[in-house]
Amino acid sequence: MLKPLGDRVVLKFEAEKEQTVGGFVLAASHKEATKVGTVVAVSETGIRTITGDIVPPSVAVGDKVLVEYGSGLEVKDGDQELVICREADILAVLA
């Protein structure tokens, strides 16, 4: 398993769906703008501010998140396709 450093997180993206849970069909431009993923690993350290304080990660393993399409670096870990991105690339945590 990958262990991210600094402010990075490891995500596994879900297969893209044609419809949302509410039954709405998403426009092709919207599907390419964002992606939904699950956090599979989070840095243990977080980020250091200018004053030297450490800010812990605001996401946890298992959170479903929305990220901008194309964010991060695609990597393979065994047979899994994962993405390593910065926490700042995460747009929202889905409830």
Curated annotation (Swiss-Prot):
Alphabetized NCBIfam families for the sequence: PRK00364.1-4
Key words of the record: Chaperone, Cytoplasm, Stress response
CDD domains attached to this UniProt entry: cpn10
Localization in the cell: Cytoplasm
One annotated GO molecular function: unfolded protein binding
GO BP annotations, alphabetical order: chaperone cofactor-dependent protein refolding
Subunit structure: Heptamer of 7 subunits arranged in a ring. Interacts with the chaperonin GroEL.
Name of the protein in its database record: Co-chaperonin GroES
Keyword Transcription regulation attached: no
Main location group: cytoplasm
One GO location term (cellular component): cytoplasm
The protein's role, per its UniProt record: Together with the chaperonin GroEL, plays an essential role in assisting protein folding. The GroEL-GroES system forms a nano-cage that allows encapsulation of the non-native substrate proteins and provides a physical environment optimized to promote and accelerate protein folding. GroES binds to the apical surface of the GroEL ring, thereby capping the opening of the GroEL channel.
Pfam families per the UniProt record, alphabetical: Cpn10
Source organism superkingdom: Bacteria
Entry similarity comment: Belongs to the GroES chaperonin family.
Keyword presence, DNA damage: no
